[in-house]
Amino acid sequence: MNLGLNVKEIERYDLVILLMAVALTCFGVVMVYSASSVMATKKFHDGFYFLKRQGVYALLGFGVMAVAMRIDYRTWREYAVPILLGCLFLLFLVFIPGIGGAAKGASRWIRLPGFNFQPSELTKIALIVYMAYSLDKKQDKVKFFSTGFLPYMVLLSVVLLILLKQHDLGAALTMGLVAIIMLFAAGTRPRYIIAMGMMALPILYFLVMNVDYRRRRILAYLNPWEDPTDTGFQIIQSWLAFGNGGVLGQGLGEGKQKMFYLPEAHTDFILSVTGEELGLIGVTVIAAMFLMLVLRGVRVALMAQEPFGRFLAFGIATLLGIQSFVNMAVVTGLLPTKGLALPFISYGGSSLIVTLFAVGILLNISTRLKGAP
């Protein structure tokens, strides 16, 4: 397979999606350096520590995206089942001593030389590919409970139980939402989804309120000022960052909250640093870029030539939309903390590489739209 791309070949792809993905990734590398340099200097005696790693992740991600762009998306339909089974196997590997890695009480990573891989990130794409394959196969049968709803709920329950065992409620909720939205778009009867939601609410309440750190997050979300030095500390510092930034920002690299005030400044709360340094204008531009990317993804889904491509593109666009919206809502205090990275921008190799891989698939679908030669 020739991976070289000439100008005419590039023009076949949705250039808006391509440009948004590249621009957000490059911006993310810059912001990771800005948000992490002080901490990296103190912890590793190298202010460029996270910048160098994120730069490598970005290059790897661009390479993976370039490969995915050239692979006919219909190829993934043939391997949907083994890919999903492989990802489920990887999810189990994190529990094996010596292979799995833990941090802050959560077992979510597989230790690789120089790199910790988070299989839940790849499982998100595997689940979307499988659901697109299955929904395409079932067609009108998706309207029936026994064939078009129950099997997906069983599969989803298995995946979510594994993720909850890893203490990864954020990934579990994300996958659940993406799956439900895909089912709704495919024609599943709304009453099934509503009934499932009503049954899930008490379970979700138990999962949150029965676990101390999750319960404290909810209480901090409702009233962070009740405990401003502990559970409410992170969101208060995030608000201070946005407040310091105002409309125009303090200037790139000039933020103060990243100086050990704001926890997770270069990961989950990197948008807060962006708000402090680039202001409301900078955050608005980033939000607009995400919105444009998601809308173009939905456009690709609507114009796809056949159902598998339609469901696959819609699932990827939905995933990008949910993850970016939830992260932005968390850092502004609209939602309780979830531990979800901001796609393309937050520090992290697994998230960035898998996200660019998904964009590559979306770009390939964009070359095979209705009316295209």
From Swiss-Prot:
Annotated keywords: Cell cycle, Cell division, Cell inner membrane, Cell membrane, Cell shape, Cell wall biogenesis/degradation, Glycosyltransferase, Membrane, Peptidoglycan synthesis, Transferase, Transmembrane, Transmembrane helix
Protein's UniProt keywords contain RNA-binding: no
Pfam family, one: FTSW_RODA_SPOVE
Entry superkingdom: Bacteria
Top-level EC class as recorded in UniProt: transferase
One Gene Ontology molecular-function label: lipid-linked peptidoglycan transporter activity
EC number: 2.4.99.28
Subcellular location: Cell inner membrane
The keyword Nuclease is annotated on this UniProt entry: no
Any GO BP: regulation of cell shape
Disulfide bonds: none
Record field: transmembrane: 15-35, 48-68, 80-100, 144-164, 168-188, 192-212, 278-298, 311-331, 342-362
Pathways involved: Cell wall biogenesis; peptidoglycan biosynthesis
Membrane topology: Multi-pass membrane protein
Any one cellular-component term (Gene Ontology): plasma membrane
Reaction equation(s) it catalyzes: [GlcNAc-(1->4)-Mur2Ac(oyl-L-Ala-gamma-D-Glu-L-Lys-D-Ala-D-Ala)](n)-di-trans,octa-cis-undecaprenyl diphosphate + beta-D-GlcNAc-(1->4)-Mur2Ac(oyl-L-Ala-gamma-D-Glu-L-Lys-D-Ala-D-Ala)-di-trans,octa-cis-undecaprenyl diphosphate = [GlcNAc-(1->4)-Mur2Ac(oyl-L-Ala-gamma-D-Glu-L-Lys-D-Ala-D-Ala)](n+1)-di-trans,octa-cis-undecaprenyl diphosphate + di-trans,octa-cis-undecaprenyl diphosphate + H(+)
InterPro entries documented for this protein: Cell_cycle_FtsW-rel_CS, FtsW, FtsW/RodA
Family according to the record: Belongs to the SEDS family. FtsW subfamily.
Physiological role: Peptidoglycan polymerase that is essential for cell division.
Protein name per UniProt: Probable peptidoglycan glycosyltransferase FtsW
Source organism: Geobacter sulfurreducens (strain ATCC 51573 / DSM 12127 / PCA)
Lineage: Bacteria, Pseudomonadati, Thermodesulfobacteriota, Desulfuromonadia, Geobacterales
